[in-house]
Design a protein with these regions (language model features):
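Conserved catalytic phosphorylation-site environment of P-type ATPases
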Residues: 280, 376, 386-447, 451, ...
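Juxtamembrane coupling segments of multi-pass membrane pumps/enzymes
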Residues: 175, 188-251, 289, 411-413, ...
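Conserved ATP-binding TGD loop and adjacent catalytic N/P-domain core of P-type ATPases
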Residues: 17, 38, 412, 422, ...
Length: 639
């Protein structure tokens, strides 16, 4: 079975990579993919071999937590953690101001010894309370032979603090006798923690934006429902509703579960209500619901009220299925992310080695102040290195892109489908049910005697959608079982240059094969069982949501409504998202490639007496992560 499980405690890409690596080593886990911005793990496992409790215990040992109890509110846990992070960040800023006032002698405490001892106490308090998680996490990682961003923070602040403590008590005895001017760096150890916490606070706030679409979908389901029990109507928790229960839904209320209308009324008609289904289908006109009509969870009666019999409840509703599909898509990984994850696993050890080399080089060539210079340069290297920016580059863009698609009633199966969409250069479309719909104004008992152009009508926006696709350089082929005259008529009406008539299901599959053999990347759009072979063969398969379940199961992209303009929108969104991923990765790698040598003091080799200090390094590191998330959020406003 496949399940998306919330994960608590991740701070960087090394965290998610370590959790993913651990899960994939467990017997009974077929595959696991961990999303840092999504704060979740998508796990495909055999429950007869391994339980959720066993997985939770293994991840707890690493210092993280899998939330497997469905009664536990993940939102409440995350809110508490966010409030605690805000409190620690604010207090750390106060500690930073205090230590700066003392270290810079803005507050005169008399002797240098007293000044250093007060700074030591401030730094220690900051480390023990505000920075405690860095040391606890890095210790747990060390026990399991792994490392993450917390390891770099713990190492850098620990080294700066211990060296400063040594100088506070033994500086004169050890350094002054050798003619070396010594300093303490408590301000650096405090400021590093402050800037890292500030960066994480801003990052969490920004990451909330990437998950806004899924939260909006979850908010579509009500917390309670009105259950009819004889002559009584009671308001009960949604979780208590069972299949077969009779429910009453009033104007403005959200439909609690999927079901069938058994009675309806409104001021317009005595036997029907009107329900806004735009949040599911994108259709702006309220749908008429009479006895026997199907209603979906999350939709809202705009006029009238009705009673319904519950048919699908809980995780079986269409809304729950959509939410699950979007969560799985957001938790999936683009091919490039696999490479980044491997880099994240070795990034921290590599940075630690670079810091060690930096220390040794400065110690050997640094002259009288060799040791202090060597230590501060190594600390700056440890602080400025940022695996978070690399780790966030791909998943944040994917979360925003897939979430934006879902808000437009476009369901994308996974990251690979989103990435493939941008490469499409040919679209093959079915006619009946995809481009056209039956004419509602005719008597269907006499339809066979009517001209073909009167039996069907072109879907609204179909012509505009086909024109937009062709403007994007995508060839469109229409497949129809009609005779040539009818097929040519509908192709011309839709603005399609290439069409095939009298086709059988096998012909659709053959056309897809021929186009692929010619080097084309083919997208197939259809809505029926006779399209499934071609859908399965296409590079990208697109199903109409009102089509058959078989077509939707095969498809990589599902359009929940009838508006075909969603197809060019999906392709443009794919192009924007992939471009954003590469943009994010470029800046994340450039940041590390440029900043690590500058922190190590490379400019001294060219006669420039400047390098990035540990305090500035921590600020730059925080900025790099936040900037990647904010850059991804630009997708929400891109057209």
């Amino acid at each position: 079975m496949k399940q998306t499980i919330p994960v608590i405690g991740m701070a960087c890409s090394a965290c998610s990579a370590n959790i993913e690596k651990k899960l994939n080593t467990l017997k009974g886990v077929n595959s696991a993919s961990v999303s840092l911005p999504g704060r979740s793990a998508l796990i495909d496992f055999n429950p007869q071999v391994i339980s959720l409790e066993k997985m939770k215990a293994e991840i707890n040992a690493l210092g993280y937590d899998l939330v497997i109890d469905k009664e536990t509110s993940v939102d409440e846990i995350e809110k508490r953690e966010y409030v605690l992070l805000k409190r620690k960040t604010a207090l750390s800023w106060l500690f930073s101001i205090a230590v700066m006032c003392v270290s810079m002698r803005w507050i005169d405490l008399g002797s240098r010894d007293i000044t250093n001892q007060v700074a030591l106490l401030i730094a220690l308090a900051n480390m023990l309370y505000c920075g405690r998680q860095f040391y606890v996490s890095s210790f747990r990682q060390l026990r399991h032979g792994s490392a993450n961003m917390d390891t770099l923070v713990a190492l850098s602040t620990g080294i700066a603090f211990l060296f400063s403590t040594f100088n506070t008590f033994w500086g004169d005895a050890v350094w002054a006798s050798r003619g070396v001017v010594w300093h303490t760096y408590f301000d650096a150890s405090v400021m590093i923690i402050t800037f890292v916490l500030t960066g994480r606070l801003l990052e969490e706030k920004a990451k909330d934006g990437t998950a806004s679409s899924i939260r909006q979908m979850m908010g579509m389901a009500p917390k309670t429902a009105h259950i009819v029990d004889g002559d009584k109507i009671e308001e009960v928790p949604l979780s208590t509703i069972e299949v077969g229960d009779i429910l009453e839904v009033r104007p403005g209320e959200k439909v609690p579960v999927d079901g069938e209308v058994i009675w309806a009324e409104s001021f317009m008609t005595a036997d029907a209500a009107y329900v806004d289904e735009s949040m599911i289908t994108g259709e702006p006109t309220p749908a008429e619901k009479k006895k026997g009509s199907k209603v979906l969870a999350g939709t809202i009666p705009s006029q009238g009220k009705f009673r319904m019999r519950a048919r699908q409840v809980g995780e079986d509703t269409a809304l729950a299925h959509i939410i699950k599909m979007v969560q799985e898509a957001q938790g999936s990984k683009a091919p490039v992310q696999r490479i980044v994850d491997k880099a994240a696993l070795v990034f921290v050890p590599v940075v630690a080695c670079i810091a060690l080399v930096t220390f040794l080089l400065w110690w050997l060539i640094g002259g009288n102040s060799a040791l202090p210079q060597a230590i501060m340069s190594a600390v700056a290297v440890l602080v400025i290195a940022c695996p978070c920016a690399m780790g966030l580059a791909t998943p944040t863009a994917l979360m925003v892109g897939i979430g934006k698609a879902a808000q437009k009633q476009i369901l994308i199966k996974d990251a690979a489908a989103l990435e493939s969409l941008r490469k499409v250069d040919v679209l093959v479309t079915d006619k009946t049910g995809t481009l056209t719909i039956p004419n509602k104004n005719i008597d269907f008992t006499k339809a066979d005697n009517l001209p073909f152009e009167e039996r069907e009508t072109l879907k609204p926006n179909a012509r505009e959608a086909m024109d937009e696709l062709q403007k994007k350089g995508i060839e469109v082929y229409m497949m129809s079982g009609d005779k040539d005259e009818a097929a040519r008529y509908w192709a011309e009406k839709a603005g399609i240059k290439h069409y095939h008539s009298k086709v059988l299901p096998q012909d659709k599959e053959n056309l897809v094969r021929q186009l692929q053999a010619a080097g084309k990347r083919v997208a197939m759009v259809g809505d029926g069982i006779n399209d499934t072979q071609a859908l399965a063969l296409a590079d990208v398969s697109i199903a109409i949501g009102k089509g058959t379940d078989v077509a939707m199961d095969v498809a990589q992209v599902t359009l929940m409504g009838d508006d075909l303009s969603a197809i060019p929108e999906a392709i443009q969104l794919s192009r924007n998202t992939v471009r954003m991923i590469w943009e994010n990765l470029f800046w994340a790698f450039i940041y590390n490639i440029v900043c690590i040598p500058l922190a190590a003091g490379l400019l001294y080799a060219f006669g420039i007496d400047w390098q990035i200090t540990p305090s500035w390094a921590s600020a730059l590191m925080a900025f790099s992560s936040v900037s990647v998330v904010l850059n991804s959020l630009r997708l929400r406003w891109m057209k």
